[in-house]
Amino acid sequence: MKKTILSCLMLAGVACSASAISIPDSLNYTARIGYNIGSTAPIGMPATIRKMNSYKIVANVSYGIDVQKDLWNNWGLLTGIHLENKGMEIDATVKNYHMEMVRGGERIEGRYTGRLVTKCDEWMLTLPVMATYRAGRWLLKGGPYVSYLTTKHFDGYVYDGYLREGDPTGPKVEMGNEEGTRGTYDFGSDMRRWQFGVDLGADCQITKRFGLYADITWGLTGIHRSSFKTIEQTLYPIFGTIGVMYKLK
């Protein structure tokens, strides 16, 4: 909540500053606020993930200030700075899923079968660099982005299942559904600080000042470092954003 309030104050401050100073006529400034929905997921559903039991929508917000310049004909360039949150919470059923966890104060590793809950939360500063194409009141855009994570969490627990230590034929460790009998894990320290990807989207100007926008961002780097091997599949951040925008100039 503190981050949200601070972000709103920052965005309001930038907007007021932009209206108080002289902005070159060739530049278009836009303030944005949106909602992110998506997940960190592997490309394709691996055989070890048998079923998605639930997906919990969390409060993912995005604030941004962009500057766009028309260069030739209908083509232009857009960049800016965004403060955004990308998070998820899922419950899945897995089989022979490689995991490392803590149960009863002891760290164990092996092949897990049963229910698994994962929570991921990322706050980041994102810099997009996008080509734009203007078509009437529409502005189509696409290009790469880079994000720096200021906050990163990836944790969860397993329950109603069992772990075979070492390999699928190893000693069996039962997992219950109460806090003392579940296995917990935390891989936040193994997450990358920097993320790279591509962003495709469109802005629609409804009035002279207000409009709507939608974007799809697809991470090209996994959320964990390449040296992280506990989860066998690489997890990519894939999110869509919808929101409103205000043309500062």
Where are these regions (language model features)?
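Transmembrane beta-strands of outer-membrane beta-barrel pores
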Residues: 35-39, 83-87, 135-137, 146-152, ...
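Extracellular/periplasm-exposed beta-strand and loop segments of Gram-negative cell-envelope proteins
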Residues: 39-58, 86-122, 149-195, 221-239
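A hydrophobic membrane-anchoring alpha-helix module
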Residues: 203-205, 209-221
